């Protein structure tokens, strides 16, 4: 929603302040296939395995999202 940096549903989330819906100090992300321990995963980390001859999807190192490259099983 507007003004939110993260989903503030769970007070146990170490990356997101449940009271403000903002990332905690030092956190880059709170969830996503390319988010691990509140940090963006390294560029090239496989975040989704492809099906067949397509390439696996990999993290960009700049976002918690996993960009789609091909077909999946």
UniProtKB/Swiss-Prot annotation:
InterPro entries: Disintegrin_CS, Disintegrin_dom, Disintegrin_dom_sf. Residues 1-73 form the Disintegrin domain. Keywords: Cell adhesion impairing toxin, Disulfide bond, Hemostasis impairing toxin, Pharmaceutical, Platelet aggregation inhibiting toxin, Secreted, Toxin. Signal peptide: none annotated. A motif (Cell attachment site) lies at residues 51-53. Inhibitor of ligand binding to the integrins alpha-IIb/beta-3 (ITGA2B/ITGB3). Competition with fibrinogen for the RGD recognition sites on the alpha-IIb/beta-3 integrin results in the inhibition of platelet aggregation induced by ADP, thrombin, platelet-activating factor and collagen. This is Disintegrin barbourin. The lineage of its organism: Eukaryota, Metazoa, Chordata, Craniata, Vertebrata.
């Amino acid at each position: 929603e507007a003004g939110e940096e993260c989903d503030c549903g769970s007070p146990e989330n170490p990356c997101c302040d449940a009271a403000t819906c903002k990332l905690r100090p030092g956190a880059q992300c709170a969830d996503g296939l390319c988010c691990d321990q509140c940090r963006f995963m390294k560029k090239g980390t496989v975040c989704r395995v492809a099906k067949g001859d397509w390439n696996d999807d990999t993290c960009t190192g700049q976002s918690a999202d996993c960009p789609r490259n091909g077909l999946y099983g």
